[in-house]
Amino acid sequence: MYKRQHLFQNCYFREKNKHPLRYVLNFPAYTEGYATYAEIYSYQFLDATKEEIDILQNNAISTHCLYALCDIGIHAKHWNQKKLSDFLANHGIVTADNAKAIYETIIDSPGSYLPYTIGYLEICRIRDTFQKSAGKNYTPLLFHTFLLDIGPTSFPVLERQINGWLKEKT
């Protein structure tokens, strides 16, 4: 599912945005956050009960958040493997092998989990603001189209664009 989210996002962006400068700019929190958002959003279309879908969605974002916290702990708070293992044990991951694998994965790629997590959370926050401001005019399609039309950018720019659009429309 992950690669398909990026494929759609990238093809859509290339179709809508022709300015060459846009292709050299990199906004990983938007890009990875969108992929995470699209993945988690897509679970509602599975042939499953609402309870099962909620579990899948909550598990996905909880896992992203847990790994982001581990990333911050290791790289910003200088956790060693023991400290990470203790942290993970408090969150239900109790085997030393699992803790070691997570530590080695995160130590090799500083900051790699944060764009997925922070990007997803920012997109959800912006979506909620958009939904509240748009009121009865809100549809998921409207928000998703707007998000994709703008394309990869910083979240402050995305928010300004959305706020400007909302002022025009409401």
Predicted regions and their residues:
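N-terminal maturation segment of proteins
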Residues: 3-170
